[in-house]
From Swiss-Prot:
Annotated TM spans: 13-33, 48-68, 79-99, 109-129, 139-159, 163-183, 200-220, 228-248, 272-292, 304-324, 333-353, 358-378, 399-421, 475-495
Organism this protein belongs to: Bacillus subtilis (strain 168)
Entry keyword set: Antibiotic resistance, Cell membrane, Membrane, Transmembrane, Transmembrane helix, Transport
Name of the protein described by the UniProt record: Multidrug resistance protein 3
Domain of life: Bacteria
């Protein structure tokens, strides 16, 4: 095998290793959410279940900006491997957890590793490939990310139903081990890096502010009331340390986040879009399965399968966005994305309990197609105009804002859906005569419990139909509200300019 062929083979294995890492990290939170009912039933401590997600997301989000900067300073490989090893250790420990407290701690360990995988993987692709090949690769990586995000609920339901909840964590071990082998064996990177000063002040203030904000968002309205001293205190500490972070970063020699990047129009708009898209597309993965299970009366596994059309649309959109990066501007490609996303969400917002499932499939495919573009285009746009030594910071910022948008979107839209559902129930039963109606709304606990097959069959049709209408209306109302951030995204896209990915030949010609 000659040198060129050997290098190409090595690169393919590196790409495979990175794809496996993205598959695990992107799928993890949604696959675990599906299994939470079984986990609580086995380990108990229902009052602590919110901490299982919170501890993981806090660790992931706190680590993302730090890993991005460190990978710029000291190399991608070592920090990707560090994240991978921590993620695998955390996954194995989660699988053997005997108490809810243990699971919470082990999820935090898993999150410490998970924060490195996604941003560094995308950055390595930019380091490995010339501009004309990056689009295809970023399209592939974006497709895997989008696929993983919606594959999680389906896979989680299947594993939980057929094996046990422990395997939603154990499944990461063989996947991660393969990724570890491919990266160690085939990814070659210089081990020499110039000595640089780490911005400890920025790192500490940023981590503390993110930890407080994420805990407030994850636990508010669940473990603690929004107006409780705990949540208000977390928001206050977040504000103090976030202001301190800005002050420290202005004076730092090597800031964790270089704010001068936001003076670049393409970079700035890509970050805004990552936040808006993240906060909007996640509600599809969350509420569509609930709609199918609650309104149509499907099983949890069947509800997971309903996300398949969105997966297909997302993969197609991501690949198209990646392939055409050198042929069309980021703005024009993202306009196609946002138009499809808007149409799909608008159609979803008009669903009723009588909407045929075939139409739901079509609406989801349209939405998924629109969403898919952002997975490949926005990381590329973030790094497009920057030198290699800033790519890690740029992409980790993009990944952070997308994840933050997802967390905020679930929190805000989840609260809205719950409130609308409760109000609709009260309105529906206020007109019913007799005790069957007067206490029905108050006796309803977790809406998803009601729509389990065993429970559903015991509810009188007159009451069940009203509950279904309330659930349907509350979810479609959320889809209607989601049009607001999509419109804001459309306006933001108009400011992206005419930039596109330039090929190597074009850059050489310009340099000469």
């Amino acid at each position: 095998m000659d040198t060129t062929t050997a290098k190409q083979a090595s690169t393919k294995f590196v790409v495979l290793g990175l794809l496996l890492g993205i598959l695990m990290s992107a799928m993890d939170n949604t696959i675990v959410a599906t299994a939470m009912g079984n986990i609580v039933a086995d380990l108990g401590s229902f009052d602590k279940f919110a901490w299982v997600t919170a501890s993981y997301m806090v660790a992931v989000m706190a680590g993302m900006p730090i890993y991005g900067k460190l990978s710029d300073m000291y190399g991608r490989k070592r920090f990707f491997l560090f994240g991978l090893i921590f993620f695998l250790i955390g996954s194995a420990l989660c699988g053997i957890a005997q108490t809810m407290n243990q699971l919470i701690i082990f999820r935090a360990i898993q999150g410490i590793g998970g924060g490195a995988l996604l941003p560094i993987a995308f950055t390595i692709i930019f380091d490995l490939f010339p501009p004309e090949k990056r689009g295809k690769m970023s399209g592939m990586f974006g497709a895997v990310f989008g696929l993983s995000s919606v594959l999680g609920p389906l896979l989680g339901a299947i594993i939980t139903d057929s094996i046990s909840w422990h395997w939603v964590f154990y499944i990461n071990v063989p996947i991660g081990a393969l990724s570890l082998f491919f990266i160690i064996r085939y990814y070659k990177e210089s081990l020499e890096h110039r000595k640089q000063k780490i911005d400890w002040g920025g790192a500490i203030t940023l981590v503390v502010s993110i930890v407080c904000l994420m805990f407030a968002l994850e636990l508010g309205g669940k473990t603690y009331d929004w107006n409780s001293i705990q949540i208000i205190g977390l928001f206050i500490v977040f504000a103090v340390f976030f202001i301190a972070f800005f002050i420290v970063e202005r004076k730092a020699e090597e800031p964790i986040i270089s704010f001068w990047m936001f003076k670049n129009r393409l970079f700035a708009t890509a970050q805004i879009l990552a936040f808006l898209y993240g906060g909007t597309f996640i509600i599809l993965a969350v509420f569509i399965p609930i709609f199918v299970q609650a309104v149509y009366g499907s099983s949890a596994t069947s509800a997971g399968f309903i996300l398949t059309p969105m997966m297909i649309g997302s993969v197609i959109g991501s690949m198209i966005g990646g392939i055409f990066q050198t042929k069309a501007s980021f703005r024009n490609l993202m306009l196609i994305s946002v138009i499809a996303f808007f149409i799909g969400m608008l159609l979803l917002s008009n669903m009723t309990p009588d909407t045929a499932r075939v139409w739901l499939t079509v609406f989801m495919m349209i939405s998924g197609f629109g969403v898919g573009f952002n997975f490949s285009l926005l990381p590329a746009a973030s790094m497009n105009d920057l030198e290699p030594r800033f790519r890690g910071t740029a992409n980790s910022t993009n990944s952070f804002l997308r994840s933050f948008g997802m967390t905020l979107g679930v929190t805000i839209f989840g609260t809205v859906q719950t409130n609308v559902f409760t109000n609709k129930l009260n309105d529906a039963f206020s007109g019913m005569k007799g005790s069957a109606g007067s206490g029905a709304a108050q006796n309803i606990g977790d809406p998803q419990e009601i729509f389990q097959a065993g429970t559903r069959s015991q509810i009188p049709d007159a009451i069940l139909n009203r509950i279904i209408d309330a659930m349907s209306s509350s979810i479609t109302y959320v889809f209607l509200l989601a049009l607001i951030p999509i419109v804001l995204a459309a306006v933001t896209i108009l400011f992206m300019g005419k930039a596109r990915v330039k090929t190597t030949a074009e850059m050489t010609k310009k340099a000469n």
